[in-house]
């Protein structure tokens, strides 16, 4: 997943729906700064502890709905190079996707456990100036019909 994003050590990224920070902590080793967003308070506390235990100081774990925290980052004019969206099964709210596009982010790595909401959200992003790049299904649950899918989207046009 991180390989798809082609992260650089000068990048500032966002990891939405970050849980206990697993992806954030791996990404933090490759980039300048990670803003990690999670709505579950105990998960944020665990993520902060995980960062401390691993001597990671460039990951900031923010408590709140991704949809709200993104608006706060926009109001602070935070410049972001890439975003990792590990979406819930219901997918993302359209307003959240519009906010991401409004930030001028060049690369979005979208992780989904629901092909239907993935397709819906990809269509929204296409309309917001992004194209679909690499797609990698991941069989995290062998013997079941569940599949995770990792998708790279790249900006090709300004937000509409």
Where are these regions (language model features)?
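Rossmann-like S-adenosyl-L-methionine
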Residues: 1-160
């Amino acid at each position: 997943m991180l390989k798809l994003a082609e992260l650089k050590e000068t990048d500032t990224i966002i990891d939405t729906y970050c849980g206990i920070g697993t992806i954030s902590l791996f990404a933090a080793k490759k980039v300048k700064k990670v803003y990690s967003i999670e709505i579950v308070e105990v998960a944020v506390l665990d993520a902060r502890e995980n960062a401390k235990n691993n001597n990671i100081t460039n990951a900031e774990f923010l408590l709140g709905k991704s949809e709200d925290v993104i608006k706060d980052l926009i109001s602070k004019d935070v410049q972001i190079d890439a975003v990792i969206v590990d979406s819930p099964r219901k997918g993302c709210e359209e307003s959240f996707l519009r906010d991401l596009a409004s930030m001028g982010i060049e690369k979005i790595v979208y992780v989904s456990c629901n092909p239907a909401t993935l397709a819906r959200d990809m269509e929204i992003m296409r309309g917001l100036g992004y194209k679909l790049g690499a797609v990698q299904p991941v069989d995290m649950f062998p013997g079941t019909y569940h599949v995770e899918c990792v998708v790279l989207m790249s900006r090709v046009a300004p937000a509409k």
